[in-house]
Amino acid sequence: MSDSTFDFNVFIKESKDVLVNPKSYFSTMKTTGGIAEPLIKAVIYGAIAGALAFLWSILNLGAITGGLFGGALGIMIFIGKIIGSIIGLFIGAVILLVISSICKGSTDFEANVRVTAACMVIMPISAFFGLASHFNYYLGSIIGLAISVYGLWLLYNGLVEALKANKETAKIVIYILIALIVLIMIFSIGTL
């Protein structure tokens, strides 16, 4: 367990650093110190994403709005985002651990949890731009694709800088993941 307290100002600074300068952030990121801090980060990112999704549902601007349950759907989206962020933190860390071991990087679970939590800064951004699907499905898909590719760029920097993975292997893995995301998007648009 970590004896330190959570500093919200440091959280905001680190969130900005991850988005603006991921290479620098991940090269100086702490990979130890307990799981409490990354868990708090994940919950905050999930709560912000949930609040935005809730707002879009209240204003009828989200991809899924109204219907039989009305505003209750928005509350469930909020709660679901928070629970999803906690579950996603640990599942994402396990997936990242496997990717890191393939790329000859760190196999320390805590370090992988910390990188995963840092990459979850994308959640509120994705939720914010989720309203684009309300106006135009294709625009929303393209924006979602761009956000996903940027998230993979963050993941690449986390692998190479914080987890000390092999750069070339990490590039190949990220290219494969980008190709999978693009294919899934193309097939999902094609089914409309």
Name what the model sees in each region.
Residues 52-85, 126-148, 184-192:
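Membrane-helix interface segments in multi-pass membrane proteins
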Residues 17, 46, 50, 74-77, ...:
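Generic alpha-helix structural propensity
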Residues 1-49:
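N-terminal juxtamembrane cytosolic/stromal segments of multi-pass membrane proteins
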Residues 42-50, 54, 81-90, 116-120, ...:
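Alpha-helical transmembrane spans of integral membrane proteins, capturing the lipid-embedded, hydrophobic core
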Residues 36-45, 72, 76, 80-84, ...:
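Alpha-helical transmembrane segments of integral membrane proteins
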Residues 93-180:
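Hydrophobic alpha-helical transmembrane segments and adjacent short intramembrane/lumenal linkers
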Residues 28-32, 66-71, 164:
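Helix-boundary and loop/linker segments of multi-pass membrane transporters
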Residues 2-9, 13-16, 30, 61, ...:
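Selective transmembrane helix interface/packing segments
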